[in-house]
UniProtKB/Swiss-Prot annotation:
SUPFAM superfamilies assigned: UDP-Glycosyltransferase/glycogen phosphorylase
GO aspect biological process, one term: lipid A biosynthetic process
UniProt source species: Sodalis glossinidius (strain morsitans)
Keywords: Glycosyltransferase, Lipid A biosynthesis, Lipid biosynthesis, Lipid metabolism, Transferase
Gene symbol of the encoding locus: lpxB
EC number(s) from the headed UniProt entry: 2.4.1.182
Keyword Lipid biosynthesis in record: yes
Name this protein carries in UniProt: Lipid-A-disaccharide synthase
Length: 382
């Protein structure tokens, strides 16, 4: 009888996890061409040959109401996965993101003697820090995108490996600004500002008016300023268009459909909501200002829970305020415009900022897929 192939269990719960999982499978195939991959997968992981017991869509729920409605089904799936992985006894189990689902599953499997990895650290360094103890009990290794995440886990003696960020691998150290401008129809000599008011309905509602009023002030300072606004989907575009007509109908703004990365590369500066967009903007080598608002009660709660001095990833990576953050009441058109003006006009300030962006990019550009694969192999061979 032939020996059983190396078997790796994987669970991904959303599109970003499906992308990471597919990259991990590709990298592992380079070392283990006969390996078997089973679990919960999206279309990209299945295209790499993974056997899906459940489709990823089963786990992809958003919002409290939907989670409550789907909770019995989610709990049944987790119990079934626990049973099936326990019976199969994979050589290693990898939970990809979706921490509320996967970390509990990892803990159950680890108690049954199955080695486990959690791929993508939750933001325990920022809030709900006591989760680190549950993670430590549940996993044999955490794979972290960012170096300060590993430093946090080290403080609690929880095994963690910094593998770099897949987004940093995907983007050039020296983006082609001329090509991006040509693709978007922006003149090489024009000043260009990108506005990115977020991907969520609530973000576009809270930020768009202030962002547009800031852009109006900058247009007065820099006549002919090109203003581009990439929007993530038709719903956000329609929402933004409604606000534009109400707030700044005369402002010459060009709306783009889901071309955020090209807009960042093409722009001289960007005004954006916090989140992964700030990291992507740094990797695009585009100077930025971060503006963010939320409902007062939510902000008050966040201030009590969040333990970091900054919210944007460039600042967290640099360990200082590299990028201006204007949050809540500070997120006013006058302040936003004042922070953006030197980024559009001061070549020395821009050059210093871009040099730092490039340095930080190099720091997290580590071939994350391959690093993750090697971490999995190390655990299998331990």
């Amino acid at each position: 009888m032939s020996a059983r192939p190396i078997t790796i269990g994987l669970v991904a719960g959303e599109t970003s996890g499906d992308i990471l999982g597919a990259g991990l499978i590709r990298a592992l195939r380079g070392h283990l061409p006969e390996a078997r991959f089973v679990g919960v997968a999206g279309p990209r992981m299945q295209a790499e040959g993974m056997e899906a017991w459940y489709d990823m869509e089963e786990l992809a729920v958003m919002g409290i109401v939907e989670v409550v409605e789907r909770l019995p089904r989610l709990l049944r799936i987790r119990r079934d996965l626990t049973r099936r992985f326990t019976a199969l006894r994979p050589d290693v189990f990898v939970g990809i993101d979706a921490p509320d689902f996967t970390i509990t599953l990892e803990g159950r499997l680890k108690r049954r003697g199955i080695r486990t990895i959690h791929y993508v650290s939750p933001s325990v360094w920022a809030w709900r820090q006591k989760r680190v103890f549950k993670i430590g009990r549940a996993t044999d290794n955490v794979l972290a995108f960012l170096p300060f995440e590993k430093a946090f886990y080290d403080c609690y003696n929880v095994p963690c490996q910094f593998i770099g960020h897949t987004l940093a691998d995907a983007m050039s150290l020296d983006p082609d600004k001329a090509a991006a401008r040509q693709a978007l129809g922006i003149a090489a000599e024009a000043r260009c500002l990108a506005l990115l008011p977020g991907s969520r309905q609530s973000e576009v509602a809270m930020l768009s008016a202030d962002f547009l009023r800031a852009a109006e002030r900058l247009y007065e300072c820099f006549p002919g300023l090109e203003i581009v606004v990439p929007l993530v989907n038709p719903a956000r575009r329609a929402q933004f268009e409604h606000i534009l007509v109400a707030v700044a109908p005369a402002l010459p703004v060009r709306l783009l459909d889901n071309q955020a990365r090209q807009a960042m590369i093409a722009a001289d500066a960007a005004l954006l909501a916090s989140g992964t967009a700030s990291l992507e903007c740094m990797l695009a080598k585009c100077p930025m200002v971060v503006g963010y608002r939320m409902k007062p009660l939510t902000f008050a709660l966040a201030r009590r829970l969040v333990k970091t001095p900054w919210v944007s990833l460039p600042n967290l990576l640099a360990g200082r305020e590299l990028v201006k953050e204007l949050l809540q009441e500070a997120c006013q058109p006058e302040a936003l415009a004042a922070a953006l003006e030197p980024l559009l006009d001061d070549d020395d300030q821009r050059a210093a900022l871009l040099a730092m962006f490039r340095q930080l990019h190099q720091q997290i550009r580590c071939n994350a897929d391959e690093q993750a694969a090697r971490a999995v192999l190390a655990l299998i061979n331990r």
